[in-house]
Regions:
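Surface-exposed loop and adjacent secondary-structure segments within mature catalytic domains
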Residues: 1-72, 104, 110-114
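Short, glycine/acidic-rich beta->alpha junctions
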Residues: 26-27, 75-76, 85
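C-terminal functional module detector
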Residues: 49-59, 64-66, 78-192
Length: 192
């Protein structure tokens, strides 16, 4: 990812500097359009839920949004995964705290009505670097848990093929010239 890009906000409420109002993106669709217009293909974006139903079909763009949030301090949202798969989206699944306190997996519930302990995401990365994290997100090599004391687990899912298979390095429904490679094995998140 490139540093120093324009900050795009959904609002300038409570922000004194109003000099960049023209970069505001009031909807997710506007945000994805701005990314595409500026050829910012390496951004990371997740569909986040604040405890209430959100229709992922209104703004999902698989070029930028590689995962959806299934759990946070606001509850568990399995419906977003069902909606994504029903619509043919190839997404990974993440869990977050949404606690804003820097306590992954140990945040307080978001609200009494639909609150829960914050979730966790396990990223299956070869090393702890920004590039590995971005690659892990883009290839959906991650999974979510509901957090808490029992939510810290390591899970690996893989398969082997009896015959040669083809792995797509991106969603072939989104990329016109999607790069492929032959494979005899695949892991969680791979598109074969």
């Amino acid at each position: 990812p490139v540093e120093g890009r324009k900050m795009r906000r959904s609002s300038h409420a409570l922000i004194e500097d109003q000099s960049d109002l023209d970069t505001d993106c009031h909807t997710a669709s506007e945000l994805f359009e701005a990314f595409a217009d500026n050829k910012e293909w390496d951004v990371i974006s997740f569909a986040h839920c604040g405890g209430r139903y959100a229709d992922i079909t209104k703004a999902h763009d698989g070029r930028f949004e590689k995962s959806v949030e299934v759990h946070s301090a606001w509850g568990t949202f399995e419906w977003i995964v069902h909606d994504a798969f029903k619509n043919g989206y190839r997404v990974g699944i993440i869990g977050n705290s949404d606690g804003h306190k820097g306590r992954p997996g140990a945040s307080y519930p978001g609200a009494g009505w639909f609150g829960a302990i914050g979730g966790l995401t396990c990223f299956l990365m070869p090393d702890l670097s920004r590039n590995s994290l971005v690659e892990c997100i883009n290839t959906r090599h991650h999974y979510a848990t509901t957090g808490g004391p029992s939510g810290r687990m390591r899970l690996e899912v893989s398969m082997s093929f009896d015959e040669p298979a083809t792995q797509y390095l991106d969603d072939p429904l989104l990329a016109k010239n999607c790069t492929t490679k032959p494979c005899s094995q695949a892991m969680m998140g791979d598109i074969v």
